[in-house]
Amino acid sequence: MLDWNPALYRRYEDERTRPAQELLARVPLPEAARVVDLGCGPGNSTELLANRFPTAKVVGTDNSEAMLASARERLPQARFELSDIATWAPQDQAPDLIYANAALQWVPDHEQLIPRLFAALAPGGVLAIQMPDNREEPTHRLMRAVAAEAPWAEPIGNADRLRTLLLPLGGYYDLLAPAAARVDVWHTIYQHPMADAAAIVEWVRGTGLKPFVDRLPADLQASYLAEYERRVDQAYPVRTDGKRLLAFPRMFIVAQKKA
């Protein structure tokens, strides 16, 4: 997959930052010395963490050079590192908070990943995770449906496999509960008013649609996006104010390690 586009991602930054704020609000730590923001993107979540824990050493990690450049421009005083979550491990002392907002859905093998991240915490530390749970929403079902048709099917191939199939929420609880002092899990469906079908397509182009479009040559990108937008227009009815409501389910997990 090509590198991420921070400018495209930030077009809906307020909507993307809201679940990050709500995840952080449920972190049961009055203070923290070491905080890691896994998959920090353009630094919007890292900024929240730095404001919540002003005396902490906050480190943002991402596997995208473009996202890290955007994050460094936003927070020049913060520390950012190029890193793959699948192989990440603390470089020195164990962190008090490992925070991953809208990142782990791109990382495979959650049955091994989640316990490994939890084990990396300091005693009493917290693992906080938010992941989009929208694979069966019309936006994502239509991505796959159009991608399965000619002339797009052959170049797109198995792009959908780049995103991990999430466990049921109870599955994450079961992974963490035996070693945790407390586990808090919940599910929220946001309803985002969008101007039109084109705005919905623009939103998902910054994330979930990217692996599909990246595999297409320029001429097929245009036709794929046009057909996808046509179907999105049919799937999301116009509301009384002329807008569309984009339902966006998200999964939240906050687990605290025993002291």
From Swiss-Prot:
GO CC term (a single one): cytoplasm
Major location category of this protein: cytoplasm
Catalytic activity: trans-aconitate + S-adenosyl-L-methionine = (E)-3-(methoxycarbonyl)pent-2-enedioate + S-adenosyl-L-homocysteine
Any one GO molecular function term: trans-aconitate 2-methyltransferase activity
Enzyme class: transferase
Domain of life: Bacteria
Swiss-Prot/TrEMBL keywords: Cytoplasm, Methyltransferase, S-adenosyl-L-methionine, Transferase
PANTHER family the UniProt entry points to: TRANS-ACONITATE 2-METHYLTRANSFERASE, TRANS-ACONITATE 2-METHYLTRANSFERASE-RELATED
Family membership noted in the UniProt record: Belongs to the methyltransferase superfamily. Tam family.
Role summary: Catalyzes the S-adenosylmethionine monomethyl esterification of trans-aconitate.
Name used for this protein in its record: Trans-aconitate 2-methyltransferase
Organism expressing this protein natively: Variovorax paradoxus (strain S110)
